[in-house]
Design a protein with these regions (language model features):
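Detector for small/aliphatic-rich hydrophobic stretches
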Residues: 19-20, 25-28, 39-121, 138, ...
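Single conserved hydrophobic/aromatic residue that forms the stacking wall/gate
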Residues: 1-15, 45, 155
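Conserved inter-motif catalytic segment of the P-loop NTP-binding fold
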Residues: 115, 123-126, 130, 134-221
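Conserved nucleotide-binding/hydrolysis micro-motifs of P-loop NTPases
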Residues: 124-126, 149-153, 161-164, 175-179, ...
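Substrate-engagement module of ASCE P-loop NTPases
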Residues: 213-234, 238, 254-260, 265
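Short regulatory helix/loop adjacent to the ATP-binding pocket of P-loop NTPases
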Residues: 244-253
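Conserved P-loop NTPase
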Residues: 48-52, 56, 62-69, 80-86, ...
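Short cysteine clusters
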Residues: 4, 33-36, 47-50
Length: 303
């Protein structure tokens, strides 16, 4: 019996070694520029695409294909949809979610479309977080506001300054995508806000926080989540030295709407521009004034 047990153990160890070797052989790496997302077969000092120096790093680009929100207890990741004739598709009454911010509503084309993915870019300190937090507090809907940069106490201090109240605004300080999806499944918010996309990580990708691979994977997972649950996802993104949203340009192609928050930190006025909008015009702008209570809508700029 002891010999059989020992033999079985040896077989298990050999099989385990084969599985590990096979698994490792499937891992592929590539070199990406952390500024523009350009891909290279080997390391080099300068990026040929954007000209940045020392921004190219090696990342794992292929692992086991496991979705971040497959780890949740529900069967959300299993599609229950079937193809539907376009004439039979019924647009629900909640086609647009009103934000109680007229400037923001107009820029989006009338409000937030359920299941849509919106990306907001802008310089540090320009007011991106303030804008999204203010919308979270003004809207008459349940909002899950996730921050990977600030603690709940820090966000509460800003919320007190804004002086709007929404009992359905839930603050969650977290940067692990799996935990965020688990809470979203439990809370079932009407809107999910991520501040910021560069702070998120998923265990399905073995690379550093903010890397190109993490950015693309987390964004793809959030898009998949939004489309399957009809929960709109609003992302805040940092910008690089050229004024573009940090990371690969493909991020802007992946999302439905790209907004740019502009202004001079030494002056009070802010302009919200729309660079891309699958559900509305790109000719609208929103104008705000930064005041002690947050962002004040400027309805008539000529006054």
């Amino acid at each position: 019996t002891h010999e059989c047990s020992s033999a079985a153990s040896d077989v298990y160890k050999r099989q385990r070694k084969i599985l590990i070797t096979s698994s490792m052989s499937k891992i592929k790496t590539a070199f990406h520029c952390q500024e523009c997302g350009a891909k290279y077969a080997k390391w080099q000092g300068q990026c040929n695409k954007c000209g940045s120096w020392n921004t190219i790093s090696e990342e794992i680009v292929e692992l086991a294909q496991v979705r971040a929100w497959n780890h949740m207890s529900s069967d959300l990741s299993v599609s229950k949809n079937i193809p539907t004739p376009v004439d039979e598709i019924v647009i629900k009454d909640e086609f647009r979610i009103e934000t109680n911010d007229n400037e923001f509503n107009r820029v989006l084309g009338g409000g937030i479309v359920p299941g849509s993915i919106t990306l907001l870019g802008g310089e540090p300190g320009i007011g991106k977080s303030t804008l999204f937090l203010q919308i979270s507090l003004k809207i008459n809907s349940r909002v899950l506001y996730v921050s990977g940069e600030e603690s709940e106490n820090q966000i509460k201090i800003r919320a007190n300054r804004i002086k709007h109240s929404n009992k359905e605004c839930l603050i969650y300080s977290e940067n692990k995508l799996e935990n965020i999806f688990a809470q979203a499944e439990k809370i079932k918010p009407n809107i999910l806000i991520i501040d910021s996309i560069q702070t998120l990580t998923t265990k399905t990708v073995d690379s550093l926080q903010g890397s190109i691979t993490q950015l693309k994977t987390c964004t793809a997972e959030l898009i998949n989540f939004g489309k399957r649950t009809s929960i709109p996802v609003m992302l805040i993104g940092h910008i690089n030295k050229d004024g573009n949203i940090a990371g690969p340009k493909v991020l802007e192609h992946m999302v439905d709407t790209v907004l740019q928050f502009e202004g001079d930190r030494n002056h009070l006025y802010r302009i919200l521009r729309v660079k891309k909008n699958r559900f509305g015009s790109t000719n609208e702008i929103g104008i705000y004034e930064m005041v002690s209570e947050g962002l004040k809508e400027i309805v008539n700029p000529s006054e």
